[in-house]
From Swiss-Prot, chain A:
SUPFAM superfamilies: ACP-like. This is Acyl carrier protein. Belongs to the acyl carrier protein (ACP) family. The gene is acpP. Carrier of the growing fatty acid chain in fatty acid biosynthesis. The keyword Ribosomal protein does not apply. It comes from Nitrobacter winogradskyi (strain ATCC 25391 / DSM 10237 / CIP 104748 / NCIMB 11846 / Nb-255).
Amino acid sequence: MSEIGERVKKIVVEHLGVEPEKVVDSASFIDDLGADSLDTVELVMAFEEEFGCEIPDDAAETILTVGDATKFLEKNAKS
Amino acid sequence: MFDLTGKAALVTGATGGIGGAIAQALHAQGATVAISGTRREVLDGFAAKLGERVHVLPCNLSSKDDVEALVPAAEAAMGQVDILIANAGITRDNLFVQLRDEDWDDVIAVNLTATFRLARAATKLMMRKRFGRIIAITSIVGVTGNPGQGNYTASKAGIIGLIKTLGAEYAKRGVTANCIAPGFIKTPMTDALNDKQRETILAKVPAARLGTPEDIAAAAVYLASNEAPTSPDRRFTSTAGWP
């Protein structure tokens, strides 16, 4: 897993309080990791903070899985 | 109990009777306060009276840009915003059929839309910290209606709905949202009532007196504190018994 992937995973584990082994690329935040809609908003805010970039609403709507987040941040992370 | 040391509070309408009393009470409990209002010199005078732990942030709540800048300015000044007191409000009273569009728009903009924008910005900060206290000053007439105040009562009823929703959405994040619905409180706003109006009101109040800004401030201190219940949407009224 990429360095960004590891940081994404760490944030997801901390925010959702899930087992690290469940946080795989294909895991859906809502369907597999038990997040509700507010959790996903918070995750996006946490990603923005960690990676120093802005995630616009239309981009946030396409981030449904751990892999989606990693892919987006590999392209857009500033820190 | 009710110690607010280390907490940062933003109070709108701090130059008014109720807002001033709330800012003073939060400050007395140890909070750092950012006082906001339209009149810079009055705010400066108030700040000088309070002493340390005070920031002056003038803001015109009818301006979208001013409103959007206020919470970030408070965060920049205090490092955080733990408590938001959305207190500022205006009246443009008239008989319903004579209410002009601009009377409606002005009152909704300052009382309701600004409250929404400030609460939205503050909640974003608070949910990250897992602590926040949003307290909006509504009015008993938002529940009862009041002749001559179609715009004002609608704005205050709107605040109640907004705050109940906010409280329900963020309760799990440690952010509580509450309204205080004052009855007739002795302030410059109610000083404008004539004797006949005052008599009519007092006839309905079992305690036969107007409330005081300090009554409202005490409720605000409680709701801002760690001791306040974390269950959402408690609506407090302070009406000296009416209605």
